[in-house]
């Protein structure tokens, strides 16, 4: 059995994402951890596959993403890349792997050798030097602002960020800083809709929302969440796309369509 894709769909590249944003075409992103799902998500037209440290939650059973190692991400990145998807492959730099620019570069190189085409890291102004260091060395970077799960203990839990005037102002400063440093994409997680909208209109790079309203350039969900596979309480920003669908591929098709036509997320999925 092979998972290699035979598709006439043009490959999604970093410049392609920028062109989509500039043209007003929504970007559909999902997490992905293996070759079989990479092939399925790619057939459905998913634009970006994220090998997220969320695998610590949904695959390994941890309460947070903190135990996930670089080897874990590299292994699952290689699994996804073997399917040769047309979607852009983005891999998370896990907790503790980008404390210095040099560490970030060495670890990003390992993920790119495994098949990543971009790396994602969590943080704002304080990461500007690291982002610039990576970009200058040909490593495309996706930043992650708002609720950054690797900071769960610093935040005191999984809480909406940017709700106060001071918090919103800091988020705007962070967004300006990461763009100026060269980030080509930014995820906004659990951010009030109005703040995320302001960030999206302020920046020239694409924004990807998760619990950040419908004005972002695109949306992302954890694959298991959008398929209704989650323990405990469902986060507000999650919609179960398996409901009413005959199979997983139809559910993914429905997700991609809903992101593209702007029907997801609705107000009930936002803050």
From Swiss-Prot:
Record-given protein name: 3-methyl-2-oxobutanoate hydroxymethyltransferase
Subcellular locations according to the entry: Cytoplasm
Reactions it catalyzes: 3-methyl-2-oxobutanoate + (6R)-5,10-methylene-5,6,7,8-tetrahydrofolate + H2O = 2-dehydropantoate + (6S)-5,6,7,8-tetrahydrofolate
Self-association state and partner proteins as the record states: Homodecamer; pentamer of dimers.
GO molecular function: 3-methyl-2-oxobutanoate hydroxymethyltransferase activity; magnesium ion binding
Cofactor(s) demanded: Mg(2+)
SUPFAM superfamilies named in the record: Phosphoenolpyruvate/pyruvate domain
Gene from which the chain derives: panB
Pathway recorded for this protein: Cofactor biosynthesis; (R)-pantothenate biosynthesis; (R)-pantoate from 3-methyl-2-oxobutanoate: step 1/2
A GO BP entry: pantothenate biosynthetic process
Its biological purpose: Catalyzes the reversible reaction in which hydroxymethyl group from 5,10-methylenetetrahydrofolate is transferred onto alpha-ketoisovalerate to form ketopantoate.
PANTHER family reported in the protein's UniProt record: 3-METHYL-2-OXOBUTANOATE HYDROXYMETHYLTRANSFERASE
